[in-house]
Amino acid sequence: LAAKHRSAAINISVVRKRNLVQAHVVVLACGAPHNELALSFVQAGAHVVSMSDDADDTTALLDLNDLATQHNRLLVVGAAASPGLTGLLLAHLATQFDSIDEAHVAVHGTGGPDCARQHHSALAGSSVGWHDGSWLRRPSGSGRELCWFPEPVGAYDCYRAEVADPALLHRAMPQLQRISARISATRRDRFTARLPMLAPPNAEGGMGAVRIEVRGMRGVSRAMEIVGVAERLAHIAAIVAATT
């Protein structure tokens, strides 16, 4: 139904508009932004699944919820690895507690070229975290934390980044008092984040991983659980989107 190609000098979009009204479910797997595409598909009568991981784009997509409801359509936002799998892992871990109040996400690796560009951009923006009832902004690339991922990935330094997870996790579980998200990055990644990418991204990233740390109460005791998945992030995102 639709195809999109983007490079440093070329931006090409091709859409077979006649097929828009024939689609029952559309999965948006191209790079951000998705909000205008989602609007077109919803108005054409299709259910929409977005794999966007851009913070501003996902906020704009959430604003389309009322429109989707008016058209009796479903608009699923954040159906990828992060966000996406992170929410599923949070929901799974929540069943292991009597109550939860903290969730901390960390991601290593990228999927395809658009994912790599988003990783680069996320380190240049301002991270957003939920802290005791308030949204806090911190510079991306700050707040180094050594995060252990499932083997064969292992441990990587992770940093605050402008990603969509905190807003979506807070919307899904408003009882959470603290939410943060970090991505792995090298020193070069952080120092060059505000510059154009020095080299074109690979067609597909290598082995990646997603983990989430959840804290809460179990009986009268404070408890913490960590769960993660190691796999190519493109594979994770595809599985989440396909099974949504």
Residue ranges, per PLM feature:
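Low-complexity, glycine/alanine/valine/leucine- and proline-rich hydrophobic stretches
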Residues: 226-242
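Rossmann-fold NAD(P)-binding glycine/threonine-rich loop
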Residues: 52-75
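General beta-strand structural signal in soluble alpha/beta enzymes
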Residues: 50, 75-77, 105, 181
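NAD(P)H-binding glycine-rich loop region in Rossmannoid oxidoreductase-like domains
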Residues: 5-60
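Short alpha-helices
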Residues: 75-94, 244
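Catalytic-loop motifs flanking and including active-site residues across diverse enzymes
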Residues: 85-89, 165, 236-241
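Active-site-lining helix/loop region of Rossmann-like oxidoreductase modules
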Residues: 95-225
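Short gly/pro/ser/thr-enriched loop/turn and capping motifs at secondary-structure boundaries
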Residues: 54-59, 81-85, 110-113
